[in-house]
Structure formats: C-alpha cells, structure tokens
Amino acid sequence: MIEAKQTGAQAPAAASPERPAVVARAFGALPDQSASLALLRTIADETCTPGPFAPRQPLALYGAGNLGRLARDHLRAVGEDFDLVVDRNAEALAAGGGWAGTRLVHPDAVDTEMKRRAMLAVSIVTSPYAPLEAALSAAGWRDIVPFYDIAESFRDRHPLSNGWFAEPFSDNDVAAIGAVLSAWDDDLSRAHHLQFIAWRRLRQEWSFDGAPVTIDDRFFIPQILDVMRPNERFLDAGAHHGSVTARFIAETDGQFASILAIEPDEQSRAVLEQTRGGFPSDQRSRITVSDALLDSERRTVRFHHGLGYASQISPTGTSERATQTLDALGAAPSFVKLHLEGGELGALKGGIATLRKYRPIIVATVYHDADGIQATPAWLMDNLDGYRFLFRLHSWCGTGAVVYAIPEERQ
C-alpha cells in the first residue's frame, strides 16, 4: 500500500473551537489497482461523519472570484446576511462595480476583533483548501469553513449541491466503487478518484505526486485534444453562457460541423444567445440553441430557474417543465459534454441509443451528487463497449470532477 509522505508538519490548528482543521494527506506515488483498493478500504474504515455547517453572524466571505459571486448570490437568495468580502484584489474589485453595495476588504485590513468573532466562509476552490485554512488560522481567523459546507445547510430551499457529504460505505459499496477504480484507464484517474472520495466521505484533502489538479483544461484535457477531429458535431448540454462552446470553437480553430448548445434556464439562455451572436456569421450559422431539459424519460418536473450555474431540476423549483431525452432530440453528436448539476446520469440514460449509435466522445461532470462516486462512471462502463475511461479533477474541495469516455477507435 502507498503510504502518506512524512512532511514533519505539526498537526493543523483547529478551524474553529468546535471542529478540527481539514486533514491533508500527501502520497508520494500514483496508486495502481491494488494500492487504490487498499486506500479505498482505508477511507471506508474511517468512522467520522462530517456534515454541513449552519452559518452564524457575523459572516464573511473569503474570495470574490466566480465562486465568491455565486456565494454572494446564494446567501442573498436564502436570506442570509454577510458583513464583508475579503479579497487581495479588493480595491480593484470595488472600482469595477460588480460588487456595488458590498464591503470589500483586503486581508491585511481586517481587524483582529472581526477575525475573532466572524465565521469565514472560504469561497475559493482553485487552490488547495488545507494550506489556505492554515494560513488564515495563522493570520488570526478563528472560525473557518468551506462555503459549500454552509450552502449544504440550505438544501431545503436552494438546490446548490456542491457541498454534499457521502454516507459511510457498506461492503457492497466498497466492492462497487473498487470495480470502478480498477476499470480506469490510468493510475492518474485512480488518484483523482480517491482524492474526490476522501473529500466527500471524510473532508480530508488528499494529493498524489504526479496527479496535479489542472484548473484550465476542464473538458479539454490532452487525451481529448489528441483525438478530436475536424468537423466534430458538438452537443453542449448545460451550456450556461456559452463558455465551453467558445472553448470548443477555439480548440477546433472554427473547423466544426455543428454545435447544439442546450440551456434550459431562460436567463442563462439569453446570455448564451448573445454569445452565439458574437461569433462570425459562418460559425454562428452552425450553432443551434435549445431550451431542452434533459432527463432519463419524458415527464413533468419542478425546475428551479434563475440561479445561474445552479439552475436545475429540483423540488425547490417554482416552475413546472416537461423534460426531454437526448434520444428524442434526434441529434447525431460526435462529442457530448454534460454539465447538468446532478442530472448527468439521467441524461445519459435517456440517450443510450444515441450514444451507442454515434459513439461520441463523452465528458460529464460528476461532482454534484453521490452518483459521481460510483453510479455514473459504472453506468458508462457497463453500457458503452470499446471505450476507455478517465477521471480528472479540475478544482479542489471535491469539485471539478469530470469523467471522460473516449471511443477506442479514436486512438
């Protein structure tokens, strides 16, 4: 079994008087099949049961980037106040106008009393959490928690689910997860899958030498770029404002056959249409925008709209929508991207005929619910013959997890 590296570091300081800091474990090598199964058993044998944290006042956010803006909007949506936002670029952000009405403060300008009294919700997932938590603790902050762990306490009224916690694993769970670990095409996938599981089950931050978390290549890792061809037919499900569509066009240098960009949220789709309108006419004519709400079958569901990235099928939604299957779209994709806030497995099931007929490259996010640990990758592995499967992390705190399915004939 691979052992965690001995760093000589002292035990981390508590994130608050009530809870310990996040434990970081660094491993010196990538895990092969045997080592990954042993490490999975280590996770399964842990008895801790971490859970969400209700916010308390005064509340501060740390980080004013994309996640910081999402955190701000989420807290406002659930009626939770916050006092300030701490960011090293506070002055420039304040001048930009995107944070009008919000108190933005440089970390060095926060007074000692605020650090002692406030709960600090970290809204950054583009760097490791544990060393940031340790640095904030050393700077005098007394109560530090990942923002997503706070968001999880509002699931009864807001569907944002990126802070979910995995339940303890039974022996059957361990066997099923182990089968997926063994089936990945490379040891890097096993390392990232274990890192994902350790955060979700234990709130431990694992890392492996040779397994960097890459922020900038989500959906377009080298193994995907190596097999992309001219004239791909791209299906972008969960297109949001069109950033992935734009990235696809850039990666193909505009040499694609068609793009079907699917976005069920009206507000996001309006921005998507603007994005489409900004492309040259010869590219714009090959892009179709759809409002389809993908699922495993046609049915009527509640849809929570107006939440930007987090809009999704949810009991908290106030509108009723008819879902549609990928098969019913009549598309013939050669490349399918799914980012559906937990709806990925349902969309895959509703597209089985299309996937088997056209054998596209598939890239799907799997970090929005517990299906990502085993059910979604296992479904792909069980239902698509002649594919190789990879797992990659593109951010920290158990987020940014993507499964990649590449047809063997693309080699």
Task: List the model feature ranges, each with a label.
Residues 2-62, 68-82, 88-411:
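Phosphate/nucleotide-binding beta-alpha loop and adjacent structural elements of enzyme active sites
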